[in-house]
A protein has these predicted regions:
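Preference for long, amphipathic alpha-helical scaffolds in soluble/luminal domains
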Residues: 1-183
């Protein structure tokens, strides 16, 4: 028999159990990424299919976009999407190595000089977003010491990424600056 790369699934839980209902919901309504994550966490699936599904959201600048975080749509990379990607990688034990080095280069490129991440990058507006996502106009020089076009750093955007990278023992120059910003 040819090897397909798919891991054999354990038998499904009894038909009336909450896990069975959750599994049915995932297979009927979720994106491929969430299906692979469910299989990884509950059906003894591998991490490679999760990583492959996540790769579809990676952008040319090594960030993540394409609506990875459901609260923000559009193809462009955003710190919000990239933080979501790091959480996925962390959940499957793959938050390290060259993959995360490339993500840190992206984070360096989009952060303020002190390492802070913006919630939403300027110039990336015009795509649908949840009503609570802070999409604001490009900062003016008067309200931003960095000048027009530079985003304000946000603690709420920076802290989760910094904490996750520290938990995974990632070392990067951007991370040192971002850590100082958080403290």
């Amino acid at each position: 028999m040819a090897e397909t790369g798919a891991s054999p699934h354990p038998p499904s839980p009894p038909a009336r159990s909450p896990l069975f209902r959750a599994e049915q919901f995932i297979w009927l309504t979720a994106r491929v990424l969430e299906q692979r994550r469910f299989a990884h966490h509950f059906l003894n699936g591998g991490a490679d299919p999760v990583e492959t599904a996540l790769a579809a959201y990676r952008t040319e600048d090594e960030g993540y976009g394409h609506g990875l975080d459901p609260d923000l749509r559009g193809p462009v990379s955003q710190p919000l999407h990239t933080a979501h990607a790091l959480r996925v990688l962390d959940s499957i034990g793959r938050c390290g190595g060259q993959r995360v080095e490339r993500v840190c280069r992206y984070l360096t490129a989009v952060s303020t000089p002190d390492g802070a991440l913006p919630a939403i990058r300027p110039g990336r507006r015009g795509y649908p977003a949840a009503p609570f996502v802070p999409v604001v106009d490009t900062p003016s020089p008067a309200s931003n010491p960095l000048g027009r076009g530079h985003p304000h750093g946000e603690l709420l955007a920076t802290v989760p990424v910094v904490g996750l990278l520290h938990r995974n023992e990632v070392w990067h120059a951007w991370l040192f600056r971002a850590t100082d910003f958080c403290w």
